[in-house]
Design a protein with these regions (language model features):
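Mobile, glycine-rich extracellular loop/lid and propeptide segments
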Residues: 6-13, 24-39, 44-61
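A post-motif C-terminal structural segment
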Residues: 1-4, 10-13, 18, 55-229
Length: 229
């Protein structure tokens, strides 16, 4: 996926997550991501916010390594064990009891379809998941059950910004592309606007902080819409 190029600065084979391209000299060695490097080398806090299920391509590209982006049974445990401070997104059914037990044993608070719990949480390590797999499109979202991507972004920034060494946060409006594939222009536009509000939250923090870079990029930046018969 293209996200690997962003977070590792290295091209890869289509369908992989953060491993070197097929080459006998490299033999599928993992590529370190900017999230992992920031954490290991500079002690930065790290976070992921998204609306797809957590082992899906873009969140996984920041925090896991696999020759097949669809192998959630490999990818999900890697993400759980990667010591990411804050994870907010979809995928309640994918978080197994063993994974949840590991998180709880290592100081995380875990919330599953618990909006009030997430809002009240003051711990610096948190996983909050909503929806059996992916979260709802913003236009279909029940605001009493699932947070907006803007709220998720603000919650993550509030937690991560307490680290004196700074932080790395990836925010993905995951389902803009899904709606485009599904010929759903209303879903696409409303999810894009929801993501725009999340970008506004990040830019607001950056302006006030003065030491934060915000990079906004598309990985499905299609140039037009066409309707076929």
């Amino acid at each position: 996926p293209s996200r690997t190029g962003y977070v590792s600065t290295y091209p890869e084979n289509d369908g992989d997550n953060d491993i070197y391209p097929t080459d006998p000299a490299r033999a599928f060695q993992p590529l370190t991501t900017v999230l992992e490097a920031g954490k290991m080398l500079q002690g930065k806090a790290t976070g992921l916010v998204f609306t797809c299920e957590f082992p899906h391509a873009t969140p996984a590209d920041c925090s896991a390594h696999s020759y097949n982006r669809g192998k959630y049974d490999w990818i999900a445990p890697q993400m759980v064990h990667n010591d990411i401070n804050v994870v907010i997104g979809g995928g309640v059914s994918i978080l197994t009891k063993d994974m949840e037990d590991y998180l709880l044993a290592n100081g995380y608070n875990v919330y599953k379809n618990d909006l009030k719990g997430m809002r009240a949480d003051n711990n610096q390590k948190m996983w909050a998941l909503y929806g059996d797999k992916e979260m709802a499109y913003d236009i279909d979202r029940n605001p009493e059950e699932q947070p907006s991507i803007e709220e998720m972004t603000r919650k993550a920034i509030d937690k991560l910004s307490k680290n004196p060494n700074g932080f790395f946060l990836m925010v993905e409006g995951s389902k803009v592309d899904w709606a485009a594939h599904g010929n759903d222009p209303v879903g696409m536009a409303t999810d894009f606007l929801a993501f725009d509000r999340a970008c506004g939250a990040a830019l607001e923090f950056a302006r006030n902080n003065g030491e934060t870079a915000v990079v906004i990029v598309p990985d499905h930046g299609n140039s037009g819409i066409s309707l076929g018969r």
